[in-house]
A protein has these predicted regions:
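Non-catalytic, well-ordered alpha-helical scaffold segments
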Residues: 38, 137-140, 214
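Metal-dependent nuclease catalytic regions and adjoining charged, substrate-binding loops involved
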Residues: 4, 145-248
Length: 248
């Protein structure tokens, strides 16, 4: 009998997705706002374009692409419902050297709310009881940059809306802007910029955040010799890419 799994449209789609995943996002001399809060060593490796030790496979790319489709669906709903006032606006901060795009700003009862849309499988959806540290830092960064403009200087409320992909249940967490959040955001970006300027590697903090899942081989793109964000891997990559590194 013909091997259905290895023939037909799946193979074509997976090959396409793998090729698309090889296209590295280039933020130039900026950090991605969506990486706020993540291990600074990982973010520096990303910006240097260090080759990952575990490139994404086709299944991961399918999940990633499906997430984008749900994301666009939610944006179309808020737009058609008439509550969205701005979507996919580009934000850029020349002092923090951060660039990014927010998902949605909607108007509810005469006040504005910044929304960021996420998707989750049924298992992770069930155990989420509060906003993750990474999402908090990401939203806080967006709020900080938006509030630099005259139009959104009074924007204080932001939310994460998570869509469960199996049954389309939703869950929301709220984050309000205050001086404490602002100080945390500025400290993070100023610190990573100092490491970058001084050409020093910060310690890997993947094990300290969100239960340490980013330190696992399946989630850490620079896991090598039993270590997440491996310095050994970085040194090996530098040795094999001398011309590229010296050209930085």
């Amino acid at each position: 009998m013909e091997d259905l799994y290895n023939t037909g449209v799946r193979v074509i789609i997976d090959n396409y997705l793998i090729e698309e995943s090889k296209k590295v996002r280039d933020y130039g001399n900026y950090w991605s706002a969506s990486s706020a809060g993540y291990c600074m060593r990982k973010n520096i490796f990303d910006r240097l374009k260090v080759e990952p030790t575990n490139p994404d496979d086709a299944r991961k790319q399918r999940v990633f692409t499906a997430g984008h489709l749900f994301h666009e669906w939610l944006q179309s709903l808020t737009k058609d419902a008439g509550c969205s006032v701005s979507q996919e606006g580009e934000l850029q901060d020349e002092k923090l050297m951060v660039i990014g795009h927010y998902d949605d700003i909607i108007k509810v009862d005469d006040h504005l709310i910044l929304y960021d849309y996420k998707t989750a499988n049924s298992r992770s959806f069930g155990y989420k009881k509060e906003m993750s540290y990474f999402h908090r830092m990401q939203l806080g960064t967006y709020l900080y940059m938006l509030r630099q403009s005259k139009e959104y200087k009074n924007l204080t409320e932001s939310r994460i809306l998570t869509l469960e992909k199996d049954t389309l249940r939703t869950k929301e967490f709220v984050l309000f802007y205050d001086e404490e959040l602002e100080a945390e955001i500025l400290e993070y970006w100023n610190t990573i910029n100092s490491f970058w300027t001084d050409k020093k590697l910060p310690p890997c903090t993947c094990e300290e955040q969100e239960g340490g899942f980013m330190s696992k081989p399946a989630y850490n793109p620079y896991f090598y010799n039993g270590q997440p964000c491996s310095r050994d891997w970085y040194e090996l990559w530098k040795e094999n890419n001398k011309e590229k590194v010296n050209g930085k």
